[in-house]
Amino acid sequence: MSRIHPTAIVEPGAQLDESVEVGPYAVIGAHVTIGARTTVGSHSVIEGHTTLGEDNRIGHYASVGGRPQDMKYKDEPTRLVIGSRNTIREFTTIHTGTVQDSGVTTLGDDNWIMAYVHIGHDCHVGNNVILSSNAQMAGHVIIGDHAIVGGMSGVHQFVRIGAHSMLGGASALVQDIPPFVIAAGNKAEPHGINVEGLRRRGFSPDAISALRAAYRVLYKNGLSLEEAKVQLRELASAGGDGDEPVQTLLAFVEASQRGIIR
């Protein structure tokens, strides 16, 4: 049987695995589903059409599944889907999607969401992402796997943060960060390849060397973006361990709608 504190409120219709723990004064809404071994801290609110997987830890006073901060929202039954093994610390806010987008906000698996983080409507956060304290994601932001966002940073709506990239603390990001790149500042500018992070995740020396070469093409050689794309295509077909990550970088750049940081 679920271990629910007597002061907590679980509305009829909520579906909680029998191993879920709910702390004092927490509120669980009628359309919420919570998977096995998840713990919900005291005074937290999980509402809306929200689904959580297994082994999540929700800190006290977190607000999960709240209404989108979008004036066009008209009480449509939009959703929030959270995977498994996420840590969501105290006072974090995560909102459901809007019908103007896909109607769903998503958070993958194994993410570390620190205190006071905001994840706005229609955001899509991948796996193994770290969002440091007070990082603020506007609506429609997409964050790739293994990305890190520093504390006190603000991310503009519709911005994409590429996989394995890192945004330094107290930064203001208004355009896309390509995968594997370090960025920082107000406004955020590129500061090299995330070499240490790539080493920790098992990228080969050849792959890292290829990404460094790609970074020089994109940022150091004085090329226009279109000129840089031509050279990146050549690097992406050189043969070796570097081809796949350079292809990933190139595909991200070519798909950018807001433009990449430069």
Curated annotation (Swiss-Prot):
Alphabetical list of PANTHER family matching this protein: ACYL-[ACYL-CARRIER-PROTEIN]--UDP-N-ACETYLGLUCOSAMINE O-ACYLTRANSFERASE, ACYL-[ACYL-CARRIER-PROTEIN]--UDP-N-ACETYLGLUCOSAMINE O-ACYLTRANSFERASE, MITOCHONDRIAL-RELATED
SUPFAM superfamilies with a match to the protein in the record: Trimeric LpxA-like enzymes (SSF51161)
This protein's record includes keyword Transferase: yes
Similarity comment: Belongs to the transferase hexapeptide repeat family. LpxA subfamily.
Gene Ontology MF terms in the entry: acyl-[acyl-carrier-protein]-UDP-N-acetylglucosamine O-acyltransferase activity
Subcellular location: Cytoplasm
CDD domains: LbH_UDP-GlcNAc_AT
Superkingdom of the organism of origin: Bacteria
Biological process terms in GO annotation: lipid A biosynthetic process
Subunit structure: Homotrimer.
Protein EC: 2.3.1.129
UniProt xrefs under InterPro entries: Acetyltransf_C (IPR029098), Acetyltransf_C_sf (IPR037157), Hexapep (IPR001451), Lipid_A_LpxA (IPR010137), Trimer_LpxA-like_sf (IPR011004)
Protein name according to UniProt: Acyl-[acyl-carrier-protein]--UDP-N-acetylglucosamine O-acyltransferase
Pathway info: Glycolipid biosynthesis; lipid IV(A) biosynthesis; lipid IV(A) from (3R)-3-hydroxytetradecanoyl-[acyl-carrier-protein] and UDP-N-acetyl-alpha-D-glucosamine: step 1/6
Pfam families: Acetyltransf_11, Hexapep
Catalysed conversion reaction: a (3R)-hydroxyacyl-[ACP] + UDP-N-acetyl-alpha-D-glucosamine = a UDP-3-O-[(3R)-3-hydroxyacyl]-N-acetyl-alpha-D-glucosamine + holo-[ACP]
Lipid biosynthesis found in the keyword field: yes
Keywords annotated in UniProt: Acyltransferase, Cytoplasm, Lipid A biosynthesis, Lipid biosynthesis, Lipid metabolism, Repeat, Transferase
Chief place where the protein resides: cytoplasm
Cellular-component GO terms for this entry: cytoplasm; membrane
Role noted for this protein: Involved in the biosynthesis of lipid A, a phosphorylated glycolipid that anchors the lipopolysaccharide to the outer membrane of the cell.
